[in-house]
Structures are given as structure tokens and as C-alpha cells.
């Protein structure tokens, strides 16, 4: 009976009595299904945020190139939270580490944020500094 199994249960020890043929032990992996995503931001720089939004085609749009790059990044770097920022650079110049805090007028972070998968939280200090987590050589936890 179910009540007998509950009373005899030992915390942290799986119950394999009665249906051992259905038991399947497997290694844990870093993969998980994403049910929802949250994003928290702490700083937004109005002019840069507006420029970035306009460059992406306006509110509600997102460049398919950027979307593909993000999907590839998330697939290759599996985790449950990420530092995320939108950067505007001088036209035609590639973004480099020194550009992140801003490289003259009209450049730098449009906003600083952190993305969470299947949970939510605040922005860690290393995501909220001038390099938005790019200076972090470890996992930051």
C-alpha cells in the first residue's frame, strides 16, 4: 500500500521496491527543457537603447541574424543564466573588449541585464560592471 511506502521511506534514498524493472539510473547532464525565460535589467541608457532598438527594426522585432547567433551561443554554452547586454558600436567597426564600456559618443551598453532559464533573479555584480561579465574568466558563481 502507498501509506506503507511513505512510512518506510528514507529521505534521499529512492524506493525501488515492487517495480525494480522500471528503474532507470542515468548520469545527470547539463541539458534541460526550457519552459520560460526571464530577463532582469538594472541600467538602461536611453539614447543608446533607442538607437539599438531602431537598428533592430523597432519594438517587437529582432534581427534574424542576431537571433541565430544567440541560439547558437546558448546551444554551445549550456547554462541556466547569462549576462546579456546590447551594444552599439561606431558604424562599420567590430565590437571588441574595450568598446563595451563605450568608445566615444554613441557607443557602449544600451542596457545591462541577466537572462535566466526556468527561474528568475537579480543581476550579479560581474554582470553589472562596465564590461558586463566579459572580464569573468570562470563561471562567476
Swiss-Prot record:
InterPro entries: DUF5341 (IPR035237). Pfam families: DUF5341. To yeast killer toxin KHS and to YGL262w. This is Uncharacterized protein YER187W. The lineage of its organism: Eukaryota, Fungi, Dikarya, Ascomycota, Saccharomycotina.
Amino acid at each position: 500500500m502507498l501509506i506503507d511506502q511513505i512510512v518506510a521511506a528514507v529521505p534521499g534514498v529512492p524506493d525501488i521496491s515492487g517495480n525494480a524493472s522500471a528503474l532507470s539510473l542515468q548520469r545527470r547532464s547539463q541539458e534541460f527543457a526550457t519552459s520560460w525565460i526571464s530577463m532582469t535589467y538594472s541600467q538602461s541608457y536611453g539614447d543608446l537603447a533607442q538607437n539599438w532598438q531602431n537598428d533592430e527594426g523597432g519594438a517587437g522585432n529582432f534581427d534574424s541574424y542576431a537571433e541565430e547567433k544567440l541560439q547558437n551561443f546558448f546551444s554551445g554554452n549550456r547554462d541556466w543564466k547569462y549576462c546579456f547586454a546590447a551594444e552599439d558600436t561606431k558604424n562599420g567597426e567590430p565590437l571588441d573588449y574595450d568598446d563595451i564600456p563605450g568608445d566615444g559618443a554613441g557607443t557602449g551598453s544600451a542596457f545591462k541585464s541577466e537572462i535566466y532559464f526556468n527561474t528568475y533573479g537579480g543581476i550579479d555584480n560581474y554582470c553589472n560592471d562596465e564590461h558586463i561579465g566579459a572580464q569573468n574568466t570562470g563561471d562567476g558563481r
